C-alpha cells in the first residue's frame, strides 16, 4: 500500500494511502505516488513556516523522513536575492549551497554541482524542458530510479508550463517585467532514499533564473507545444549524507521538526 503524508488546509500533516493524493493536490502530477516507495509531499500554509523550495521527496524507508525534512530546512539558507532585473525574487544559489553543505551535521559530501545557462530562440517549450532535464540527470546521477525520472520530468515541465496555477506559490518569484520580457525564479528540491542511493540520502536543491522574452500573460499559459525564447540559468548540487534513523520519532515530530531548530543540526 502506498502512503502519502501531506498538510491539509488546517496546516496539519496527514497521511493518504492509495494511488493518488487528495483532489486539491492532484493537479500536480509529481505529487502522485509513482512507485512502491512512500512519496512524501510537505507543504505548510503559514507564511512563517512555508519553505520556498518545492519539495519532492521519495523515501522507501519511513525511518528517514525526518532526515529529508532537515535537509530541506538546511538548504533554505542557500536561497539568495537575485539580480536587479528580478526585483525582490530569490533563488537557490549553488555557491551558497556549497557553503551550507559544509555546516550540515552529520557531515555529508557534495558529489556534483553545476551552474549553467541555456538559451533558445523561436523553439518549442518542450525543447528547453528536455535540455534542462538532461543537465539535471547528469547532476542527479545514480539517484535516478524510474519513478524519480518521472517526477523530475513532471517538475521541470511545470517549471515552464502550468504557471497560472502556481503563480502565487511559495517556490515561484516574479521579477520585473515589460511587454517584451518576463523574469521569474523557480526553486525545487529533491530528497531521495531508495535502493539506488544505498546507505545515503541524496538531496538535490535546484534554482532557476528564467527570462522569457514575451509578456507575463503569455508566460502564465504556455504549453509544451508553444514556441518561446528563453535564457535559463540553472544552479544545483547533489549532496549525499549518511542515513539517519529517526524511527524513535512519532509522526507529530515531523510537524515539530519544521518549527523547532533543535531538530535541524
Swiss-Prot record:
- Record family assignment: Belongs to the cyt1/cyt2 endotoxin family.
Put simply, this protein is called Type-1Ba cytolytic delta-endotoxin
Keyword terms, alphabetized: Sporulation, Toxin, Virulence
Q: Which GO terms describe its cellular component?
A: extracellular region
A Pfam family cross-referenced in the UniProt record is Bac_thur_toxin
In UniProt terms, what function does this protein have?
Kills the larvae of dipteran insects by making pores in the epithelial cell membrane of the insect midgut.
Give one GO term, molecular function aspect.
toxin activity
One Gene Ontology term of the biological-process aspect is: sporulation resulting in formation of a cellular spore
Native source organism of the sequence: Bacillus thuringiensis subsp. neoleoensis
Post-translational modification as stated in the protein's UniProt record: Active after proteolytic processing.
Report if keyword Metal-binding is assigned. Answer: no
Q: Which InterPro entries match?
A: CytB_endotoxin-like_sf (IPR035918), Endotoxin_CytB (IPR001615)
State the encoding gene. Answer: cyt1Ba1
